Structures are given as C-alpha cells and as structure tokens.
Amino acid sequence: MSQPIRVEHVVKRFGAVAAVDDVSFATVPGEMFFLLGPSGCGKTTLLRAVAGLGEVDSGEFYLGQRRITETPPHRRNVAMVFQNYALWPHMTVLENVTFGLGLRKIGRRERAKRGLAALEIVQMASLADRKPNQLSGGQQQRVALARALALEPDALLLDEPLSNLDAKLRLEMRAELRRIHEETGLTMLYVTHDQKEALSLADRVALMRDGRIVQVGAPRDLYHRPGSRFAAAFLGETNLVRGTFVETVDGRARIETPMGLLKCRPSDVPLARGQACDVCV
C-alpha cells in the first residue's frame, strides 16, 4: 500500500556548510512529488537521507504514520532508483529484478512471480532472459525500475533516473514513468535538476536553493506565479524588468518600469505604493 512521506525540520551539515537547512515537506499517498533545483542545492542529500543512506544532524522522517528516522534502510520498505542503474552484468534481466527479493529470503517461485509481474509493468517481460549488455539505455532503466517495483515498496525514490539517457529517450521515459505511476499508484519522491522533467511529470514540485525549499506547489502554479526572482529565472525563460509598484486598477497591478507603465497580473500583489519589484515578461 502506498504511503505518504513526511520530512520535518531536517538539517544536514558538512563542516560549516548546511547542505540541507531546516527542510520540511509532506507528500500525499500516491503523489509524484519532485525535489527540483540546481546542482549543490541539497536535493540528493535529502533523498538519500529519506532512504536511510545518509545520516542527518537533526530532523525526523515518517512513512505514513511510522517514524523511520533511525530505521535501517532495508527495513524502511522504500525502494530507490539511482542515476547509475547498477545492474549485475553476469545476471539476466529477471535475476537482476529479483535480486533484492532473494536478500529478503523470498522463495524462488514467489520471486519469479513478482519479478515477472514487475517486468510486465515496465513492458520488459519478453526480455527477461537477456543480459544487461544486450539492452539499450532505456531498457536498462526499465529494468532498474522493475527491480524497485518488485520489492512492493510503500514509496519509490528516484535520483535523477533519466540523466544518463539521450534527449529522445528521456522524452519516451517521461511518458513511461507517468504511465507506471498511474498504474501502480505509488508515492514517488523524485530528484532532478531538469525543469522540463519536473514541470511535465510532477503533481507537486518543491523548488530548492542552498539547502532550503523556497517554493512548493503544482507545476503550473510555480511556472505562472513564481515566488521569487530565483524561481522565475530557474523555472523558465523570462525577461526580468525592474520596476516600482504604482497601484492596482481594474484587477491589474500597475508597475512603472524603464519600458513604461506595465499592467500586470496578479492583482493581489503584496506591495506598497512606491515599492521596488521585478516584473517577469
């Protein structure tokens, strides 16, 4: 059964640098929740901490109602798909997919059943007897996904899983990930620096910068209503014009700029008359 993930006031420092700085968020069951941000913003450090692969200095992690802060990784019942697929070259596709089940002492017959079911989900059952070197990059990614799904986790963690694929394959795998998410109903926590990936796949996005979450919302809301200059610049191509707030008339904010007077949305801009602001064009 899919479970929500809750992160409360997590801090992780490397020396004097706070890689994760008092971060809190909560997903809902079955949500595809993205951690989006530039390199070095702390998103992968945070994801690894959720998985139990990295310790934090303070904070709490919950999976559903279960506190998992000190729970070892193999007992959290989350599965992780890494940037590097980490497939055993000497094993077949099915053997790779069922490897984790073997570590859990699942019987051979049940392992095969669950492994083939996972391969069916990613449309790779017909290639169960192949070795990884006989597969394309996209097929190897599907095998890595199937290996995670075979564990029947409460949540799936993905660390930039499409970054090693070419542009065409990335587009194809985005569609596959959306289909798999809809079919399984799993809670997915997904890390990426790719804005298009996040905006096209996510139910909600947490935008990170310098170890902090600066904005959370649906992709459309973040794109059309960025909460800061950083969000506007990072989430899309935009021209930022410096201006001064004048007044709101007929539901539109009027901003005086070097280009002249601009009439902007939204009308509920929390600005005082004469206050400096940025306009996204």
Feature roles, as predicted:
Residues 75-79, 83, 87-233:
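ABC ATPase nucleotide-binding domains
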